[in-house]
Amino acid sequence: TGIIIKALSGFYYIDDGSAVYECRARGNFRKSGISPLVGDKAEFELSGGSGVVTAVLPRKNFLSRPPVANIEGFYSFFFENPAPNEYIIDRLTAIAVYHGIEPIIVFNKCDAGDFSRWESIYRAAGFRVFTVSAETGEGIDTLKSEFSGGISVLTGNSGVGKSSILNRIFGNTALKTGEVSEKLGRGRHTTRHTELLRLTGLSTILSNRASTINGRNRTGKQ
C-alpha cells in the first residue's frame, strides 16, 4: 500500500515509504468508473519489475481539476498586480468548502502592496489569511508551519509567486520560475504536470493554476 504521487500517460507512481514504483491500473477500474488519482492511497502488486494498481482505498475528498484526492489544505495565492479579484477568491474558497477542504488565502509580495482590505474581509468571514513575500522571505516561515501534514493544493494564476514560494519553503529550486513581465501583466511560468512535491515526511504539495481548478460532486466517481 502506498500513495500515488504522480500520474502520467497511464502510469501511476506509488510511494510506499521506502521506494517509488511505476504501476499500471487494472482494467476493472474502467468498468467501475473510478480512476486512480494523485493523492490516492492505493494497493498494488509487483511482478517482474513492474507494478499493477489493484485497489484504491476510500477517499475523503477529491477534485477533478487538478485530479487529486485526499486534500488537507487548499491555498489560494494572489498579489497586487493585478489586484485580487473577489469573485475568484470567493469561487476558490467555495470549491474548497464544498469539498470539505480547508481554504487558506495567501497574498504574496507584501513589500509591494497593501492587502489590508482583503485581509479584513476574509478574516472576518472566518478564513485564515497570510501575507508573505517570496522576494524578501517575510512571512514564509509562518506559512511553512501551516503544512503540518497531508496533501496541500496551491493555486493561483501565473505570476503570483507559487513556484517562488515553494522554492523558499524547500530551500532549493523546486520549480523553474520566470520574472513577472510588467509589459504583459503576467508571469511566464506555467505548471505543466500533476505531481506531489514532498515538503516533510508527512506533508506534500501540488501546485496548479487557478483557472484550471474545478470540483465535482463529493460522492461522484472519478
Can you describe what each PLM-predicted range is?
Residues 10, 27, 33-50, 57-74, ...:
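Helix-rich effector regions associated with P-loop NTPase G domains
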Residues 12-16, 23, 44:
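SH3/SH3-like beta-barrel fold
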